[in-house]
């Protein structure tokens, strides 16, 4: 019906984002960590939905669908919000404001990043019920899908927040690029003075990531909902009861019905491809660095040791000799006698005195 390769792309994308996740945690970049989490959850949900509802529209997992539709709705703004946090971090470093920041300022910056990456998506998802006409719908091969009523309130609570967050991210990205370009010759010194774990190469990759979000994914999102915004802005909301009539009914849409709606089919495919495509770009930028590759080697080595496919390397003879020398040296210091040393020095002085006489 739609496509048979998206679920497999999503599964591969999940593992590609998972592989360097430990390294991202060490970097302590809240925006990058949260973006990794959202991409992993989005791709895993995409794969599970496609597999469970591959050839059916039956309501097989109501509890899972309740969570899935909220996750899908949350991802509309969670990914742009994470990019906004990354762009703010880059602008703060390049503008040298982070140089003048104290420990309290760093703690405050982490809290603000968490509010952006986690708080905004939670509030955005909690308001989903206002425009939600049914608990969820089921699309063959796509799985659980949010069901919304389009009106001016949908534009205000669903479409507008994503556009505002994306525009803020674009502004910070532009400012970060401006500062980077102005201070490009001494930028390594700027990074060193900011006490940041980001090096120049990593900074450029983060800047490219925010630029791709601004130049690629934001236009795709606006392009897919522009017509809907134009048609919905003048539609009245009605009332709560009219919007939620038959809320517990679960609409089911077979593949043949979806294929009849060309616009909906196109938007559906784009919506399903955003997470896998974002994950592949993310991995290409942050999953192939030297430090990350070294982490892969260490993890692979530990896995071989755990499965007993490789033996623990034995210490060389040279290491044992060095260790023995260190032990002997340490013991010789322990047996040092201050009294003996003093007496010997005194006898030497007496002998010299007698010779002089």
UniProtKB/Swiss-Prot annotation:
- Please give, as recorded in its UniProt entry, the membrane topology of this protein: Multi-pass membrane protein
Question: Is ATP-binding found in the keyword set?
Answer: no
Q: Its Gene Ontology molecular function terms?
A: mating-type a-factor pheromone receptor activity; mating-type factor pheromone receptor activity
Keywords of the record, alphabetical order, are: G-protein coupled receptor, Membrane, Pheromone response, Receptor, Transducer, Transmembrane, Transmembrane helix
Q: List cellular component terms (GO).
A: plasma membrane
Chief subcellular site? membrane
- Tell me the segments the record calls region Disordered: 338-357
One BP term from GO: pheromone-dependent signal transduction involved in conjugation with cellular fusion
Biased composition annotated in UniProt, kind: Basic and acidic residues: 343-357
Which residue spans traverse the membrane? 5-25, 32-52, 67-90, 110-130, 145-165, 206-226, 268-288
Q: Where in the cell is it found?
A: Membrane
Say which family it is in: Belongs to the G-protein coupled receptor 4 family.
Function text: Receptor for the A2 pheromone, a prenylated mating factor.
What is this protein identified as?
Pheromone receptor 1
- Originating organism: Mycosarcoma maydis (Corn smut fungus)
Taxonomic classification = Eukaryota, Fungi, Dikarya, Basidiomycota, Ustilaginomycotina
Instruction: Tell me the gene name.
Output: PRA1
């Amino acid at each position: 019906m739609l496509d048979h390769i998206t679920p497999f792309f999503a599964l591969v994308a999940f593992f590609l984002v998972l592989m360097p996740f430990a390294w991202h945690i060490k970097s302590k970049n809240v925006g990058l960590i949260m973006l990794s989490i959202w991409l992993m959850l989005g791709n895993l949900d995409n794969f599970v939905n496609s597999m469970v509802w591959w050839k059916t529209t039956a309501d097989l997992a109501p509890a899972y669908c309740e969570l899935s539709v909220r996750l899908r709705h949350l991802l509309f703004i969670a990914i742009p919000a994470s990019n906004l946090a990354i762009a703010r971090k880059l602008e703060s470093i390049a503008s040298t404001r982070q140089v003048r920041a104290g420990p309290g300022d760093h703690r405050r910056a982490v809290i603000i990043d968490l509010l952006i990456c986690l708080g905004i998506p939670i509030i955005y998802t909690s308001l989903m019920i206002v425009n939600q006409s049914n608990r969820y719908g089921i699309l063959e091969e796509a799985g659980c899908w949010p069901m919304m009523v389009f009106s001016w309130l949908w534009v205000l609570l669903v479409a507008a927040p994503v556009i505002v967050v994306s525009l803020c991210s674009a502004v910070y990205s532009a400012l970060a690029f401006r500062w980077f370009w102005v201070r490009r010759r001494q930028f390594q010194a700027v990074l060193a003075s900011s006490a940041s774990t980001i090096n120049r190469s990593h900074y450029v990759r983060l800047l490219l990531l925010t630029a791709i979000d601004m130049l690629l994914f934001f236009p795709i999102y606006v392009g897919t909902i522009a017509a809907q915004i134009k048609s919905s802005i003048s539609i009245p909301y009605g009332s709560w009861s009219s919007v939620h009539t038959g809320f517990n009914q679960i609409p089911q849409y077979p593949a043949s019905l979806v294929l009849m709606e060309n616009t909906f089919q196109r938007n559906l495919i784009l919506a399903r491809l955003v997470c896998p495509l974002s994950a592949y770009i993310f991995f290409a930028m942050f999953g192939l660095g030297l430090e990350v590759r070294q982490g892969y080697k260490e993890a692979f080595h530990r896995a071989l040791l755990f499965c007993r496919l490789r033996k623990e390397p034995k210490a060389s003879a040279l290491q044992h000799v060095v260790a023995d020398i260190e032990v002997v040296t340490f013991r010789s210091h322990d047996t040092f006698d201050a009294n003996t040393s003093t007496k010997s020095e005194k006898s030497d002085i007496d002998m010299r005195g007698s010779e002089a006489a």
